[in-house]
């Protein structure tokens, strides 16, 4: 959980800085974390955030 909190902090900073490439990478990492935890709701939420940032990064 400590690693998740670190990723989340980095994700929030990348959003603040409008660094969508970094935000998408972190969202994908967080998505994989929740998938490994077996939490489908969080996995789905982070998959959507990942896709949003990928689209904005282009």
Predicted segments, located by residue:
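Short, charge-rich amphipathic interface segments used for partner binding and complex assembly
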Residues: 20-58
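N-terminal acidic leader/helix
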Residues: 1-28
